[in-house]
Curated annotation (Swiss-Prot):
Catalytic activity field: a ribonucleoside 5'-triphosphate + H2O = a ribonucleoside 5'-phosphate + diphosphate + H(+); a 2'-deoxyribonucleoside 5'-triphosphate + H2O = a 2'-deoxyribonucleoside 5'-phosphate + diphosphate + H(+); dUTP + H2O = dUMP + diphosphate + H(+); dTTP + H2O = dTMP + diphosphate + H(+)
PROSITE patterns: NUDIX, NUDIX_BOX
Domain of life: Bacteria
Entry EC no(s): 3.6.1.9, 3.6.1.12, 3.6.1.-, 3.6.1.23
Record's keyword annotation contains Magnesium: yes
Protein name: Nucleoside triphosphatase NudI
Organism, scientific name: Salmonella newport (strain SL254)
Length: 141
């Protein structure tokens, strides 16, 4: 089984949290709402990976004013690729508290939508199990 280390930002701006809706046809949680983030590349430092993933998935314009390591967790997930293949992966999630200075987002094709959500409205979204666990651990659900 392949192992992946995943950097995952919990991004907050003015009391709201950023959620991204995964594409319907790929990823670990197709069609569900999630936090952004992705895998650490070989030789890449953790914060470099976090900033690269944010740039790739959310665009160059989003400015983070604070990044603080928060917690980690692990589990085994099945990833679905765009061509329909599936793979079981051991995932190690490194989760960061992030504060953004703005809300300028330009999502890539991994996502179909995004939203800045008030804490009291987070439970209204179809959150994937990993995001639900993270938000509950944070006391937001």
């Amino acid at each position: 089984m392949r192992q992946r280390t995943i950097v995952c930002p919990l991004i907050q701006n003015d009391g709201c949290y950023l959620l991204c809706k995964m594409a319907d046809n790929r990823g670990v949680f197709p069609g569900q709402w999630a936090l952004s983030g992705g895998g650490v590349e070989p030789g890449e430092r953790i914060e470099e990976a976090l900033r690269r993933e944010i740039r790739e998935e959310l665009g160059e314009q989003l400015i983070l004013s604070d990044i603080t390591p928060w917690t980690f967790r692990d589990d085994i997930r099945v990833k679905t690729y765009a061509d329909g293949r599936q793979e079981e992966i051991y995932m190690i999630y490194l989760i960061f508290d992030c504060v953004s200075a703005n809300r300028d987002i330009c999502i890539n094709d991994e996502f179909q939508d995004y939203a800045w959500v008030k804490p009291e409205e987070l439970a209204l979204y179809d959150l994937n199990v990993a995001t639900r666990h993270t938000l509950a651990l944070k006391g937001l659900l």
